[in-house]
């Protein structure tokens, strides 16, 4: 069994943030959020990282992150390009948005030779998540079904005071495996707790603060790549006619199909760490403050890659 590798999705556009938030410094020596994720991942056992980026930001990204991290990890690059579609499909006129998280992972398909974890470049996950993820991937292989996992967080630890966030709301089975994950694209805190809307704010539904949510920290076997690739054309057929410019091929979509078909079980691992991220530019001071505090407490050295 090959050692688990880490896939970092860093090709997103940062539309709500307004800029390349993947490389916006938050640490005392110019570190960005993913520096801390990679430091935690390296301590947990991950030795190889595959960055999924766009060709246009390659040089900037390498200078800001990749070259620095390469002192401590084996760094590889994959490129998520709009034109990477199944035979017979073309990019709709006017489309600039990437095809989503599942498409990002498929961009790295040729570089993945065993189990792998997936993270967002612009989310701070905390050390616990990488420990439980690496341990699981190192000790589980596909058997009569695909044996995957995800790390869940408590909803109250993952909201932004500065606006809405999108989260995958998880329902678990009695044995701790994932029953379903539903993408809620507009979740907001309010005076009495946390709620979400699906109709532009006309009506709201409360969610308990201890609801388990996905932050796109998934653990898969290589089998997932074939499943995702084989389902892509059917997904395009179903979505391009109605939403050609904005539809996205999300990881939870394929996960849900595999669960419903009885092909996969997804163990729900848990982290009680608080999430930090920069969905909005106003979130940045909170992240800077949190990193400074964790550095002062000794959780991280001032220079991560010295």
Describe each region flagged by the PLM:
Residues 172-174, 181-306:
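Conserved alpha/beta core of the MobA/IspD/sugar-nucleotide pyrophosphorylase nucleotidyltransferase superfamily
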Residues 87-98, 163-168, 282-286:
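Short, surface-exposed amphipathic charged segments that create phosphate/polyanion-binding patches used
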Residues 125-126, 220:
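Hydrophobic/aromatic residue at the end of a short beta strand that borders the catalytic acidic motif
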Residues 69-114:
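Short phosphate-binding loop-to-helix
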Residues 127-215:
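Conserved core of the sugar-phosphate nucleotidyltransferase
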Residues 114-124:
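Short beta-strand-to-loop acidic/aromatic patch adjacent to the donor-nucleotide binding site
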Residues 61-65, 133, 287:
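Hydrophobic packing residues within well-ordered alpha-helices of enzyme cores
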Residues 2-66, 75, 80, 114:
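N-terminal glycine-rich phosphate-binding loop and ensuing alpha1 helix
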């Amino acid at each position: 069994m090959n050692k688990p590798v880490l896939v970092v999705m860093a090709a997103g556009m940062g539309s709500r943030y307004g800029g390349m938030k993947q490389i916006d410094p938050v640490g005392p020596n110019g570190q960005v959020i993913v520096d801390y994720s990679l430091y935690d991942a390296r301590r947990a056992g991950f030795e190889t990282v595959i960055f999924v980026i766009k060709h246009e930001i390659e040089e900037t990204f390498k200078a800001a992150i990749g070259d620095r991290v390469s002192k401590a990890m084996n760094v590889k690059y994959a490129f998520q390009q709009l034109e990477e579609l199944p035979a017979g499909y073309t990019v709709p006129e006017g489309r600039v948005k990437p095809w989503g998280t599942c498409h990002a992972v498929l961009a790295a398909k040729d570089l993945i030779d065993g189990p792998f974890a997936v993270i967002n470049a612009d989310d701070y996950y905390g050390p616990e998540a990488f420990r439980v993820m690496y341990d699981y991937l190192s000790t589980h292989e596909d058997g009569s079904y695909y044996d995957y996992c995800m790390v869940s967080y408590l909803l109250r630890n993952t909201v932004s005071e500065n606006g809405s966030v999108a989260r995958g709301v998880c329902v678990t089975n009695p044995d701790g495996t994932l029953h379903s994950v539903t993408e809620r694209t507009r979740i907001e805190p309010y005076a009495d707790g946390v709620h979400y809307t699906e109709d532009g704010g006309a009506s709201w539904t409360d969610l308990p603060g201890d609801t388990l949510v996905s932050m796109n920290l998934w653990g898969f076997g290589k089998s997932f790549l074939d499943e995702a690739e084989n389902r892509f054309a059917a997904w395009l057929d179903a979505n391009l006619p109605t939403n050609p410019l904005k539809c996205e091929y999300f990881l939870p979509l394929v996960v849900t199909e595999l669960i419903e078909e009885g092909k996969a079980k997804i163990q729900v691992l848990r982290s009680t760490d608080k999430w930090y991220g920069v969905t909005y530019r106003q979130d940045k001071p909170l992240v800077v403050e949190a990193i400074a505090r964790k550095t002062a407490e000794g959780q991280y050295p001032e220079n991560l890659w010295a």
